[in-house]
């Protein structure tokens, strides 16, 4: 596991890497492409998936941003004794449609074996949470937090967590448009607000009105909000960030 440069988690852990959403603003793809070793897998799984039982020396991304299970990393949470807030799979979407359920189960089992940590997951496919919950495969322990990326109203329509008894949060980073949180089927217990980073030509700068409407709704519904520094760059007068747990 690695120390995080973001303020809402203390460490990142990437037993699975790679993603197929193809988001134009993705920092993870840029990183994996930069350090892509360009190796050829002698025994890839169907669908272009990869399993690494052992570390390949000197390269964290031997197959670039193609989905890969780094099985040798599964014991890392157990080997980290001091409690941490862990962002799980910061370099992947663990709950993407292309990820085998068996991979997800291996990761969740590894988390359960190290209950001293708080685990934060994040996906653009929250329906997978429901599917796993219906199969009794989704942990409900208090140290598991399930996040959904909600960048605009299109993502709100995909959020269907109402009635599921789990800790949930939204990551509105990057915020790409106005979001009417009242339209969601179920509300999160925490919100992270942030702006797009990088220098792509179509980079979206969030409007103050978008931010203020979200903050007002969260205040009314007692939902704590964490403000990323990349958003404070535009709006330095934002209130102090808050967490749903004691810090």
Residue ranges of model-derived segments:
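Structural preference for beta-strand elements that scaffold enzyme active sites
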Residues: 85-87, 118-120, 143-147, 167-171, ...
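Short, electropositive alpha-helical surface patch
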Residues: 134, 138, 143-147, 237-247
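Conserved Radical SAM active-site core
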Residues: 1-144, 153-161, 179-183, 204
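A mid-sequence, solvent-exposed acidic-amphipathic segment
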Residues: 159-187
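A structural motif corresponding to the C-terminal end of an alpha-helix
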Residues: 110-117, 163-167, 213-224
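Auxiliary Fe-S-binding modules of radical SAM enzymes
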Residues: 1-12, 34-38, 176, 181-247
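Short, low-complexity, polar/charged sequence segments that are solvent-exposed and flexible
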Residues: 45, 105-109, 139-141, 163-166, ...
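Active-site beta-loop-alpha junctions enriched in small/polar residues
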Residues: 91-93, 124-126, 149-153, 173-175, ...
């Amino acid at each position: 596991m690695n120390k995080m440069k973001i303020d809402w988690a203390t460490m990142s852990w990437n037993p699975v890497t790679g993603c197929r959403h193809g988001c134009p603003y993705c920092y993870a793809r840029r990183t994996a492409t930069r350090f892509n070793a360009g190796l050829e897998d002698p025994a890839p799984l169907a669908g272009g998936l990869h399993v690494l039982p052992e570390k390949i020396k000197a390269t964290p991304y031997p197959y670039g941003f193609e989905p890969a299970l780094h099985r040798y990393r599964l014991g890392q949470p157990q080997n980290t004794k001091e409690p941490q807030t862990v962002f799980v799979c910061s370099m992947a979407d663990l709950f993407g449609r292309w990820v085998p359920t068996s991979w997800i189960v291996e990761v969740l089992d590894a988390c359960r074996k190290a209950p001293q940590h708080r685990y934060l997951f994040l996906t653009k496919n929250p329906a997978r949470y429901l599917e796993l919950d219906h199969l009794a495969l989704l942990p409900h322990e208090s140290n598991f937090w399930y996040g959904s990326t909600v960048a605009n109203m299109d993502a709100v329509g995909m959020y269907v967590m109402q009635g599921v008894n789990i800790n949930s949060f939204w990551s509105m980073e990057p915020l790409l448009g106005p979001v009417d949180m009242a339209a969601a089927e179920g509300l999160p217990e925490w919100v992270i607000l942030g702006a797009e980073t990088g220098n792509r030509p179509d980079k979206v700068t969030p409007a103050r009105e978008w931010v203020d409407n979200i903050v007002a709704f969260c205040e009314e519904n007692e939902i704590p909000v964490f403000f990323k520094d990349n958003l404070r760059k535009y709006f330095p007068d934002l209130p102090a960030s808050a967490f749903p747990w004691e810090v």
